């Protein structure tokens, strides 16, 4: 039986998570991409605590964007999560693309977070 895209994504994500882990010094920037929205969280895996988060569902972003499923929306989320992380003193993270290919919306989010000051 052929594997579906979702199964392939889960398999890639498990493989990535074996190698990528967030610490208090260098937390993990996790990205979840759905068909209509994108979500980003900065996570300390040791304490199992989310330090900062942003998504296209937030009222200020939702009103200013025409759709949550564009590269423009992803860049806005990347900038916002980076600003919230920097406000809490987080400058360096490890990037967890969530099994998604590093292309399009995921790449736009990562580039915007880098431009806003996060290092990874």
UniProtKB/Swiss-Prot annotation:
SUPFAM superfamilies: Translational machinery components. Keywords: Ribonucleoprotein, Ribosomal protein, RNA-binding, rRNA-binding. InterPro entries: Ribosomal_uL18_bac-type (IPR004389), Ribosomal_uL18_bac/euk (IPR005484). Part of the 50S ribosomal subunit; part of the 5S rRNA/L5/L18/L25 subcomplex. Contacts the 5S and 23S rRNAs. Belongs to the universal ribosomal protein uL18 family. This is one of the proteins that bind and probably mediate the attachment of the 5S RNA into the large ribosomal subunit, where it forms part of the central protuberance. This is Large ribosomal subunit protein uL18. It comes from Crocosphaera subtropica (strain ATCC 51142 / BH68). The lineage of its organism: Bacteria, Bacillati, Cyanobacteriota, Cyanophyceae, Oscillatoriophycideae. The gene is rplR.
């Amino acid at each position: 039986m052929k594997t579906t895209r979702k199964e392939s994504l889960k398999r890639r994500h498990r493989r990535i998570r074996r190698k990528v882990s967030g610490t208090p010094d260098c937390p993990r920037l996790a990205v979840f991409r759905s068909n209509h929205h994108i979500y980003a969280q900065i996570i300390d895996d040791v304490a199992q605590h989310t330090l900062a988060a942003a998504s296209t569902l937030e009222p200020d972003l939702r009103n200013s964007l025409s759709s949550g499923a564009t590269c423009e929306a992803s860049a806005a989320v990347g900038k916002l999560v980076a600003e919230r992380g920097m406000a809490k003193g987080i400058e360096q993270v490890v990037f967890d693309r969530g099994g998604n290919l590093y292309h399009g919306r995921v790449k736009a989010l990562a580039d915007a977070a880098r431009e806003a000051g996060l290092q990874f």
